[in-house]
Amino acid sequence: NEDFISGAVALANQTGADIYHGKYADEPIEYARKAGNGDKFEIGKWTLEVIATPGHTKDSICVLAIDNEQDGQPIGVFTGDTLFVSEVGRTDFYPEEMEKMAGQLYDSLQTLANLGDDIIVYPAHGAGSVCGSGMAEREFTTIGIEKRQNPGYQCTSKKAFIERKLKENHYIAPYFSKMEQSNVTGMDTPLPPVACQKLAQDAQSAWQKSAERPGVLIDVRSHAQFRDCHYPGSLNLPGGLLSAYGGWFLDYSTPIALVADSHQQATESSEQLWRMGYQQISGYLTMVPKPDTIEAYHRQHVNAVTADKVDERIRAPRANWQLLDVRKQEEVENNEFDQAKHIYLGYLPEMCHQLDKSRHYTLACGSGKRATVAASYLLAQGFENVDVFIGSMQAWQSYQQGA
């Protein structure tokens, strides 16, 4: 697994359970045994049967849950990264074998389809995961629903499926390599040993001032709260965006502190970071003082602009203005903004040198959320004239329909 640290070792150490993985891993998994197609495990009234489902990786497996008290009927299947709700697994982790892996995934999906329409599907990821771009916001589904609605099942042939997969554009965050190695060797600490603590008063003072800040300050409050008032130089990564995009902006040697609404929010965010291997978390702040001067207001506030204003700027563009779209490539291909420059959000750290700090940038995405993340990063890098297209593509489409 490459997007977070597995809890398998910690769970095994606490319970004495054995750990198993598929037979064809790229490297030996030091803490686990191998399980192959057809292997069965008896747990109480349940039988768990391994189904080899290569494609996402060579050792991918699914696990069929059979209820022995219901005449040995299969009830559900844990599909890992093979089948999601409204999406199927990535096949790009082997660049030299992408066609082969896509073909294997097609075969694996047919194996799952043959289990029966009533089988409940429990995937490993949900909406917002880097492991697929079209996942629906539901925690489970059924084989029958996916056969009817999942784009991966709508391909008319194996050839068509392979062609579809080869056209996909996925992103591999820099931290993936550390996650892969951590999960090969095994880590016993997928969660922080204690809850995130509020910073002491003297430490708060240092973190509040951008010139004295000893690391990266991440604001995990809502986008609206960040735009209204934030600490200059902080990075806005609330909710699932922290795990989805934090790995593009953070390194493992730099301390991190959080700005949060509550102890619970700070703790949940620190747990996300810990699962990604970021363990230098100093603590959190809760209060963001309101600016007391016009100059401070401009440093702590991000303007939001609406679709009609963006339309006005597009129709009568100024030489120093640019609409900057930070969505994924496939989103841009499906619906483009007129006259926009495209830089994927995760690529901003390596590509922001292409941007001119003297220009005025309006950040856009699908809804305004990722645009706010991008704005926070550019402001932290010294860009001064930045605002956010509120609603972004959703608002743009509604505006055009109304117009």
Model-predicted regions and their roles:
Residues 1, 19-24, 52-55, 77-80, ...:
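Active-site neighborhood of phospho(di)ester-bond hydrolases with catalytic His/Asp-centered motifs
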Residues 70-71, 76, 85, 99-194:
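Divalent-metal (often Zn2+) His-rich catalytic cores of metallo-beta-lactamase-fold enzymes
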Residues 24-25, 57, 76, 82, ...:
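Active-site metal-binding loops of divalent metal-dependent hydrolases
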Residues 90, 145-181, 185-187, 192, ...:
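Rhodanese-like catalytic fold shared by cysteine-dependent sulfurtransferases
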Residues 80, 86, 124, 218, ...:
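Active-site flanking residues adjacent to catalytic metal/cofactor-binding acidic residues
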Residues 11, 53-56, 63, 81, ...:
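Divalent metal-coordination and catalytic microenvironments
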Residues 1-50, 66, 73-75:
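Active-site HxH/HxHxD metal-binding segment of metal-dependent hydrolases
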Residues 193-202:
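A contiguous, basic/glycine-rich beta-loop/short-helix subdomain that forms a polymer-engagement track
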